[in-house]
Amino acid sequence: NKDIIKKAKPNIGHLAVAKIINSNDSAHLITQNVDNLHQDAGVPQSKITEIHGNATYASCLDCHISYELGPIKKVFLDEGIIPSCSECGGIIKQATISFGQSMPEIGMQIAQMKIVKCDLFITIGTSLVVYPVAGFPKLAKEIGAKLIIINNQPTDYDHIADLVIHQQIGEVFSDS
């Protein structure tokens, strides 16, 4: 998993999203991806909300301070010690949401704040079946935003979208 993420490079979809986000001061990316590829494609961290966290660093479960992942993993693997936060003593783990762990409250609040202010909401490459994130398009429509869904397969929200494109992401953005 670690090696896959290290070797991964942004694809045409990541680059197109970066172009969209960077062309509009108020644009914001809400992502479930944990691979840092949006940042690698050029989207500033300040314009990204990572709902499921990020697999490229670690953070304290209590105070949420970030740590470089390499040294944290090394201590755990070499010594079998669960790393603790230098600030508050809390447990440090990879900054992703694990099964059974609740969604990050701050990330969800930021996402909802961005959604209620948007006039266009685009979903790209998601089946829209896992909640609470799957409810974001409906929230956007309820506040009056236009909704675009780009996904290879149909979703349960296609009927409320203003535009639906059932194609591979690379095909949709091939000329961007």
At which residue positions do the language-model features occur?
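Conserved catalytic alpha/beta core of Sir2/sirtuin-type deacylases, generalized to analogous enzyme cores
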Residues: 1-176
